[in-house]
A protein has these predicted regions:
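Basic, helix-initiating cap at the start of DNA-binding domains
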Residues: 1-34, 38-47, 64-67
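Conserved amphipathic alpha-helical interaction elements at protein-protein interfaces in regulatory
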Residues: 29, 33, 61, 83, ...
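Short hydrophobic/aromatic patch on the recognition helix
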Residues: 49-59
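Hydrophobic/aromatic residues within well-ordered alpha-helical segments
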Residues: 62, 69, 73, 77, ...
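Alpha-helical DNA-contacting segments of helix-turn-helix folds
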Residues: 66-73, 112, 116
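Hydrophobic alpha-helical connector segments
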Residues: 68, 82-110, 157, 183
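Hydrophobic/aromatic-rich alpha-helical bundle segments in the mid-to-C-terminal region
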Residues: 117-121, 126-130, 134, 145-190
Length: 195
């Protein structure tokens, strides 16, 4: 992802960076304590020691705040994909990397399911516009193409990533599906695409 300098944006002011960090920390703490849906943005602003206008100026709406909180975790996974140990990181065959990535993305999605669900319902379609989704899509598309060039790795990557939709994962959990069974199903679909 481009940095502020690369994108031509001015560097963030120190006070703005502090406010952003305080807002994210307050949101993280309140959401962990009471749940994402039970906390208002007014409460987040108050806990962060900033005005509601500052929070809205910085994030715009609830969905943008949720996406900012997810960004930290998504960057960790991106770093592991780019620089981590195999099989998730470079050095493993594409098939092994794809399966390791899908396992890691499932873990991230389940660990932060409530936040993902809130972000997807607060701003429908916004998740597909994020740099993280674009990264996941390019990575999966490339791995599919390298493993066994399918007819359309771009489309197949979207289809495979659809399995990580928070509403779907929530519904599966409510049906009693555990992480292992969902992971097995996702890997089975990936394996079928690779043969």
């Amino acid at each position: 992802m481009p940095t502020a300098k690369q994108a031509g944006a001015r560097p963030e002011r120190a006070d703005a960076a502090r406010n952003r960090a305080r807002i994210l920390e307050a949101a993280r703490s309140l959401f962990a304590e009471r749940g994402v849906r039970e906390v208002s943005l007014e409460e987040v602003a108050r806990a962060a020691g900033v005005g509601k206008a500052t929070l809205f100026r910085r994030f715009g709406d609830r969905g943008a705040l949720f996406l900012a909180l997810l960004d930290e975790h998504e960057r960790e996974l991106q770093d592991a994909v780019l620089r981590g140990e195999p099989p998730l990181g470079p050095g493993a065959p594409p098939r092994a990397r794809l399966l390791a990535f899908l396992d890691a993305l499932l873990r991230l999605s389940l660990d932060h399911r409530e936040l993902l669900l809130a972000s997807e319902t607060a701003r429908p379609g916004a998740r597909l516009q994020t740099g993280a989704y674009a990264f996941w899509h390019r990575h999966v598309s490339w791995l599919l193409g390298e493993s066994r060039p399918p007819a359309d790795p771009d489309l197949l990557a979207h289809v495979l990533l659809a399995a990580f939709d928070a509403e779907l994962l929530t519904a599966l959990q409510e049906q009693g599906r555990d992480e292992a069974s969902v992971g097995d199903a996702i890997r089975a679909v990936a394996e079928a695409l690779l043969h």
